[in-house]
């Protein structure tokens, strides 16, 4: 009986260690895929001078709208209200067909950190021009202020 209990304990222990040593990657899809970002965030914050981001889904909504439109958050402060763990999905920088989007507001991290962010440029396809592809948290910034 002791031998069975010992084997059971050993199997459980090795299983726990395997999960800790070899974590399972949950990075499937993009933060910009429908359902991965908070579609209501912009509507709730559009008229505010300071736009507060409290969740990774809200952060993704900020990024999705910034990279998919020509609106560049002028005269707006975008402030983090919490640390952002962005490891659930990849930050796939979409190809903006106009190549005119950029961030021009104030991004205030307010002492919070963004972790687990995997930035991936968009795949080749319609509208892709390797000479003009930008990839990053903002893609392009112009007359912007970035604070920690």
What name fits each language-model region?
Residues 1-9:
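Bacterial N-terminal signal peptides that target proteins for export
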Residues 15-25:
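C-terminal segment of classical bacterial N-terminal signal peptides
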Residues 26-148:
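Surface-exposed repetitive/solenoidal architectures
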């Amino acid at each position: 009986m002791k031998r069975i209990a010992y084997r059971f304990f050993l199997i459980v222990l090795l299983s726990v260690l395997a999960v800790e040593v070899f974590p399972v990657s949950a990075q499937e899809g993009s933060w910009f895929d429908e359902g991965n970002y908070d579609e209501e965030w912009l509507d709730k914050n559009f008229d505010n001078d300071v736009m507060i981001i409290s969740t990774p889904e809200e952060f993704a909504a900020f990024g999705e709208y910034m990279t998919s439109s020509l609106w560049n958050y002028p005269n707006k402060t975008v402030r983090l209200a919490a640390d952002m763990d962005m490891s659930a999905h990849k930050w796939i920088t979409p190809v903006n067909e106009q190549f005119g989007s950029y961030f021009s507001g104030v991004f205030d991290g307010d002492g919070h950190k963004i972790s687990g962010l995997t930035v991936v440029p968009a795949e080749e396809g319609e509208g892709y021009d390797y000479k003009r592809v930008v990839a990053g948290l903002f893609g392009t910034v112009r007359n912007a202020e970035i604070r920690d």
